Amino acid sequence: MIDQIWANAAIESCLKQGIDHFFLAPGSRCTPLTLAVARQKQAHVIQHFDERGLAFAALGYARATGRPGVFICTSGTAVANAFPAVVEAAMESVPMLLFTADRPFELHGTGANQAIDQLEIFGNYVKLFSNLSVPADGSSIQGQQESAFLDSILEQAFTATKDGPVHLNWMFHEPFTIENEKPDSLACSPSDGNTGDVADHSSISLPTIEVVGNVLIVLGGCRPEEAEQALELAGQLNCPILSDVTSGLRVGSFELPTEFNLPVPDTILHLGGRIVSKTWHQWTASLADRDVNMIHVTRRARRSIRTV
């Protein structure tokens, strides 16, 4: 079946790019992708029935390693369960590949089970979306052209995921398995384009920053080595550091103040991703009438300075 050939090509391409962790929530419609992963001995598989939790596991893996994990699920509401993790990945530019199975076009709008509109279901929260309508007949010239299209899409996906999540939606036809199946000459060659090393996920880059007066560092979502850099910087500046829950920075105690009671600093240096603490945002809002410089250094080294 051409469905299986395409799935095999996609998984082999991932492995060629060093992407070897697959977060699998198996279901009938994603059988081709499941079999493709199972056939690869070097694939590391994390399997669970809870798509929401599994998507967050893929997100956590990428945060810790800088490598995208591949989230694989069946069609319908299984896809929607990944939405929270996709949003977080988008907000923090965390790499993530989503391979979702779907019913073919002819089964949409017919009342077929678990057939929902999955086209661009994650909206602007993904860096790239492609709907892959696998050709039912793999012997045509059109099918050969579409296999070249698949190679191109995979190359684009590997590049785009360096900056956030990428969604490839696979419209698979039944039957998913055939006894004694023999792949024909239409098999897609795994993508080996020069797309760079997806594992090179940029760390927080600390440009030369001139700060004056009392400094307070606040640390958002970041990788472990970035948290160590922040601690070193705090030591160099001899200033306190506040760690958001997303930072992963370990603390020696776990007090949970209902409000901040801190001396007002001259400069607030925000490193890493966004801060989710409501108390923090309330405190910074209270500084509206104070002359405080806010410097934000993100993972991509885009620096913004504002006065609060």
Regions found by a protein language model. Give the residues of each.
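Anionic-ligand anchoring segments at beta-strand to alpha-helix junctions in alpha/beta enzyme folds, i.e.
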Residues: 20-57, 72, 196-274
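Thiamine diphosphate
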Residues: 31-106, 267, 276
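A short helix->loop->beta-strand "cap" motif at the edges of active sites that frequently abuts
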Residues: 42-43, 94, 238-239, 287-294
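Glycine-rich, acidic loop regions that bind phosphate or pyrophosphate groups
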Residues: 100-154, 243-308
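Glycine-rich beta-alpha junction loops
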Residues: 103, 170-176, 221-223, 246, ...
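Conformationally flexible catalytic loops at phosphate/diphosphate-handling active centers
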Residues: 149-212
